[in-house]
Amino acid sequence: MSVYWYGKSKVASLFGTGPVFGQNANQGLAWIYYGGGLELYNELLEKLGLNIVGFFCMPMPTQPLGWFKKPIKSASDLKGLKYRTVGLAADLMQEMGTKVTQLPGGEIVPALERGVIEAFEFNNPTSDKSFGAQDVSKVYMLGSYHQAAEFFEIMFNKTKFNSLEKEHQAILRYAAEAASSDNYWRGQDQYSKDLQWLKNKAKVKVYRTPQLDAWDKILPGLEKDPFFAKVVKSLKEFSNRVAYYELMNACDYKLAYDHYFPGELGF
């Protein structure tokens, strides 16, 4: 994921973990392939001197704000909190007053147990469950804006890729698209199962995250980098049109859910 190139360029986080202007992850992929995002990504690769070819894929649901010792009810609850996240979200959460620590996934639970961190986010109910988040915290905050439209990429060595026959290059590209669809479908099934397990078996309390408007505070500073501003402008213009269509056209799914499963959501 380009989010982990953050130390090389903050622009990298815009390709998969950037701000939400109304678009979801699938619409972010539409920007990549039909809205000019891929051309900007290739420009980034050239600037960084990276000899790779990337196929963006696997749109993700909104990432949870994470695991806490007590529910987060307002921005003031984040002040001074030692919190694990990565990439552009690190700047976002620092703006909210947290003391951010960037750790790989395997170090998160031990760090919480030792008091190195007090709260953390990782990815989704399945990933969080797999490394034992529920064993060290019982408060799970969902519905955050910090990484709300994430997607992945499959990368190949550019020299090796370009040496392949065109039909073999196409096979890899279409395989990435097929894996993208299956990953999304499987994720919808598995994440929902594991969230129910966390609630019912591990006795984790699930909460909605109060929406915190830090993006507007950090973007102006980041946009002093002309290339960062160029990528944000492209994504924002595409989202303005595509998300408008989606939001104007989509039915109210929550209304239907509440009708058939009254009281389940609680908000």
Task: Name the predicted role of every residue range.
Residues 27-43:
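Signature of the catalytic double-stranded beta-helix
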Residues 1-27, 43-267:
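N-terminal secretory/targeting leader peptides
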